[in-house]
């Protein structure tokens, strides 16, 4: 009882939990962020190129994968800032506006990725379970409208991050979206994030992928290879969801529940759970690597397009090289020809032509007759 009272008095005098174990997670965060950036950037660039080829072939699912890769690229562009932040012992020294934009992109990336995974599952579910009914109803235009709506909705929901505290105590020595302890408003928002951003989408994923498994078992129109592809895609979606997003949201809701029950003394718990929270944060970041590797490179059509584009690039390169070599040889021959013609012109200038010789002879004859 005395410890609780003492803790409550201490919490009234401070607004930030002291002695958070930031240094313990420094190496892990910097390493994971660096690896994700080094692998995720080229992988998502490749994904966007390959899925853009699929979009040109009127593949509906390519719209969602292409949007997912663009979302990941946007988040990956902020990772160098997070690396600097962690190396500076969690002191954000790049200005309040940069913190807001970076945090906004982080939150939007998580929930846009989750919703796009749901879109991919629902699209596969409709295409397989309602194959006849969905003909002519699944189109790229509808997919684009859905993606635009999701982007706009998530952006609007997270727009309050731009109205955070305008004048923090020390702009050059502040944390960036790391609130220890939580406040009532943020804890309530975390519950909403868990329900609408994780629990409901996860329920949709389980339902649609269960129906997909049932449909592929009884389907006679799909080959064994096609059935395996559909199953792998469904398994990949669930695995990504469980590994990358589930742990982060579970810890998020645990922190919020504990704060609601122990508002006067939550700092000791925050310090104890921080290392676990950091590991799960790294898992959510690894989603930027998992998406392109599992969704695009495993796909047979995309892989064929990749090799086809590589062969086409090599063919065009060889044609370009041969054309350059041909032009070079032609240029050399032309220069040699022009050089030879120049030499002949110089020699012709030195040797008198026939008309000049005839005129000389005529003038000599006239002089002889005159004498």
Residue ranges and their predicted role:
Residues 110-148, 211-215, 296-303:
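Class A GPCR helix-loop hinge within the 7TM core
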Residues 22-34, 58-120, 127-137:
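Extracellular TM2-ECL1-early TM3 structural module of rhodopsin-like
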Residues 77, 156-163, 199-206, 237-254, ...:
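Hydrophobic alpha-helical segments of membrane proteins
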Residues 8-22, 86-111, 130, 136-144, ...:
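Loop architecture of class A 7-transmembrane GPCRs
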Residues 66-69, 110, 144-148, 192, ...:
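Internal alpha-helical transmembrane segments of multi-pass membrane proteins, especially GPCRs
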Residues 1-46, 181, 190, 369-371:
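Extracellular N-terminal segment of 7TM GPCRs
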Residues 1-20, 264-266, 300-371:
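Intrinsically disordered regulatory tails of 7TM GPCRs
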Residues 179-182, 194-198, 213-251, 263, ...:
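Intracellular effector-coupling site of seven-transmembrane GPCRs
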